[in-house]
Amino acid sequence: EFRGILQQLYDNGYVLVSLRDLTKNTATDDQPMFEQGDIYLPDGKKPLVLSQEDANFDTYRIDGPDDDLLADAEGDGFACQLLVNENGELTSKYIEADGTVKYGAYDFVTILEEFVRAHPDFSYHGAKATLALTGNEGVFGFQTHPAWQTELGVEAYMEQVRQAQQVAATLKANGWSFAAQGYSKLSFADSDTDTLQSNMLKWDEQVASIVGNTDILIFPLSSDIGGVDYYSGAKFSMLYDLGYRYFCNTDTASHWVQLRSNYLRQARRIVDGAALANEPGVFSDLFTATAVLDPSRP
């Protein structure tokens, strides 16, 4: 489905741009002064910001009901890890039901990498997408949660961290950016400021230490810290003080952007199986959903 979507986006004239391309900072001190960014595309081309949430390879993606942390016959066929191969390229680890291990383009990142290699003009200045990460189940399929240090031992645990850092560095070099999605997925609308702050500080400790700091926040659970009015209040002040300047909520509109001097908020359209099957018209300006929906979906 994703390969079909990418091909249609390309054929329809879309070009990947970074979320940060939407702004330029004209400040002369530490405080931002955002203005609309300048994006220069060939005639007929249209900018597209792409992102993926839950780019963690959480346990449910790689395990069946037996909790052995291995793919099996009752699993759902997800890739289980993002790696850097011996050639310095990103690759996905995929385990067949019979235990056979494969490496290749089996997930969002590696499929997009493959597509841009074949169609370099699909990317503006090398931009790929933004990956939103949580931290409570590790990063990129590695056991980077501190609780694993006791079970694995210090040396093996640090090797997991080192490999995850290598993946992060390779992603950055290849035009990817990272967004926080909270240490664990909480509703930013329903949780109080202190709870959210504690959650975000855990993200800094356990995820930023691997992927680096970020100024992008992709809200989990289709939540937000405010309505369509300009941001204000304790939650915004807390997140701003933690360094966040780009905020992404969800919406079904073709585009929705709120640019202020000190932040940018952009709505995201969620592309998943339910939306492709039940709301195909939401994507009509991007691609024809019925043409890419896999009939093998339950």
Question: Across the structure, where does each feature detected by a protein language model lie?
Answer:
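C-terminal active-site subregion of NodB/CE4 polysaccharide deacetylases
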Residues: 1-22, 34-50, 61-62, 173, ...
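Short, glycine/charge-rich beta-strand/loop segments that flank catalytic centers
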Residues: 21-29
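Metal-dependent polysaccharide deacetylase catalytic core of the NodB/CE4 family, i.e.
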Residues: 28-35, 41-48, 56-225, 253
